C-alpha cells in the first residue's frame, strides 16, 4: 500500500545525493557485500497479496561457494545481547565459520537452522551416515509489528533454495529477505548493503618487495532499531527536522502513525544484525576488531544499543580457506599440523577499520532509502522515508 512517502521511485542514498561524501574510501563496483570476491547472497521475501499480515523472509549469505568443506576465519562483536546468533559459541572458540549465514525473524530461527542442516544432509550424507561437523549460523531481528509471527511463514526448504540460488549480484535492498518486516529509525527499514575498496599490499618476496593489492570490505545489514528523533545522515539531524516539519504541518494521521511506531519501538526495540566480509587476509582477533567498527557506523546513523536491542556483528575474511571436513584414518588429532596462510600486519589495518565503519553506515542508509511504506499485521502501518523531503533537507547542508 503506497503513501506520499513512497510515491517517488526508491533510490539508494548515493543515487539520491550523488555529491554526498561518506568516508575516505571508494565503493566497490556494486557498492554491496558481493563486491567481496566469492561472497554470494540470496533473499526470499514473503508478502503474499492474499494476506498482508505476512511481511517476512530470509537472507542467505555464503562466505564462498565451498563453505561446507572449507571454513573461513571469523570474529564476533556483541554491542547489546538481546538477540540470537546461533553457532556463535563455536566461532568464538575456533575463529572459524563453515556455514551459510542466514538472517530472518525471531520466530524463524529454528526453521532456518533446520534448513541449513537439511541442505547439508542432502548434499553430504552417504547412505544415511553423517560423519561431519557443522553448526549453522542463524541470526534474527523482531518483525512482529508488521508480521504475524504466529503463523511461522518461513519454512526450512526456503533456506536450501536460498543456498542453491545465491549469486554475486547486488543484494536486493529495503523490504526484502529477512528485512521485509523491519522498522529502522522510525521509518520502514530492512536489508541494506554497501562496500569500500582499500589500497593494500601483498606479502613481500625474497627481495622484500610487495605487490599492490586492492582489498574490499562489504557489509550487509538487517536494520530494525531506533527512533526517528535520533536519525542522522552524514551528521545532519534529519529525524528531528522531519519531526518539526510534521508538527508544523499538523497532519494528524501522520503524527498518529509516528507516535504508534515510536511507542512500539519503546516497548521492544528491534535490533540490527551486521555482517561484514572482506578478502583482506585477517585472523580471528583482527576480524573481531573489524566487527567492533560496525558500532561507529551504527552510531553515526542514530543507534544507541538500547536494552532490548540485539546488536550483533559478525565479520569474516575469505583471504584464507581452512579445510574442516578432510578428516581421514591417517589424521592424528594429537599431532599438531601446520598450515601456511597470509595475514595482515596490525599496523597497516586502519584503512580496513574505516571501511568497515563507513560501509556499515551507508548500508543502513540504503536499507531505509530503498524500503517502501508497508501496511501489515493488525493494520499497522510504517511509512518509508520521503526521499524528496530527505533530499531537500540534505541539500541545505551540502
Which sequence ranges carry the predicted segments?
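Alpha/propeptide regions of enzymes that mature by internal proteolysis
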Residues: 2-398
